[in-house]
Amino acid sequence: AHELLAQKDKVAAYVEDGGSLLAICGSYQLLGRSYYMGEDRIEGLGVIAAETVRGSDRLIGNVAVKTDLAPEPFVGFENHGGRTLLDADATPLGTSVVTGTGNNGDDGFEGLIYKGVIGTYLHGPALPKNPELADWLIAHALKRRDDAQATALLPLKPLNDTYEHAAHDAAMKLLP
């Protein structure tokens, strides 16, 4: 954690400049202000509007969440002991948990979107099962680059996502 905190200013500058970043589970938690483990507080990078508190048990299982980034729910597998609490002005990645627990099991949200950052508990693997998530990150990086070569690639041309959609559909079938 000390090595990461030493990079706090660099990470914050990258994020504030619109850099693209996918943070899953522990890295998502550490982008927030802090992680509380009982009475102990671990300082986070403070680049996203969130805090995490360790729960008494782990939240484990398949998860699906509605998101504004795709017509179908994003799917994954969650396995986390932390309960992430977003600030009131934060934008969740998952606006409604369909199955699973999401950030904390209480508020119905999963993950967070801030500038070019996606923070999430969607393991398993998130990008191949949710091609729109990969597309969002790529498009965001190209927009940030903002030169003729990058601009020529926007909007992204549709790819053959047959295998990705098959992986997504297989994950959906695992849901209770």
Question: What is the meaning of each model-derived region?
Answer:
Residues 1-71:
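Cysteine-nucleophile active-site neighborhood
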Residues 55-176:
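Amide-donor transfer/coupling interface in amidating biosynthetic enzymes
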